[in-house]
């Protein structure tokens, strides 16, 4: 099932089943019908709180589809504190694979649940903002939102 969430950064297409969020990606101006259920209702509430500056982490059941390595990266991304960033190399080290920063970048790029799995918090080793599937402008806005609400 799918739902289009209208965020301040544009539409976010949220995929879900009866038990968990399975995807959350930026979308164009499409609209989708959705079946009311507790998972999507809670997701909408938490996204509203996040964009309103009152939520710093998400507490939702997630079922992202990916390889075991990708899933381990996505789990590690969820440990990056709100308002902070980590480099690809730091995430690789966190996984016990310090030479896997490129593989971490590849997994980060394949993250199917944007914002909720905070791939926007990963930056280049030199501190530069690097690719984000939702676009660098959105990444900048998300990081700015988090920094301004974490003081």
Task: Annotate each PLM feature.
Residues 12, 122-124:
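Active-site and channel-lining beta-strand-loop segments
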Residues 125-151:
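…primarily DNA-binding HTH/wHTH and HhH modules…
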Residues 102-111:
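Regulatory, non-catalytic segments
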Residues 60-62, 104, 129-132:
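Short clusters of hydrophobic/aromatic residues that line enzyme substrate/ligand-binding pockets
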Residues 115-122:
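Short Lys/Arg-enriched helix C-cap and helix-to-coil transition segments
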Residues 1-99, 145, 149-151:
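Basic nucleic-acid-binding alpha-helical/helix-turn surface characteristic of O6-alkylguanine DNA
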């Amino acid at each position: 099932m799918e739902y289009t969430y209208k965020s301040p950064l544009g539409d976010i297409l949220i995929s879900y089943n009866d038990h968990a969020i399975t995807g959350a990606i930026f979308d164009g101006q499409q609209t989708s019908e959705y079946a009311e259920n507790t998972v999507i209702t809670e997701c909408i509430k938490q996204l509203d709180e996040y964009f309103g500056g009152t939520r710093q982490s998400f507490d939702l059941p997630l079922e992202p589809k990916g390889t075991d390595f990708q899933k381990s990266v996505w789990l590690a991304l969820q440990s990056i504190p709100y308002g902070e960033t980590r480099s690809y190399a730091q995430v690789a080290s966190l996984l016990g694979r310090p030479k896997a920063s490129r593989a971490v970048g590849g997994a980060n790029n394949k993250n199917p649940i944007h914002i909720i799995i905070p791939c926007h918090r990963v930056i280049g080793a030199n501190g530069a903002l690097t690719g984000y599937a939702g676009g660098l402008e959105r990444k900048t806005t998300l990081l700015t939102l988090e920094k301004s609400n974490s003081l």
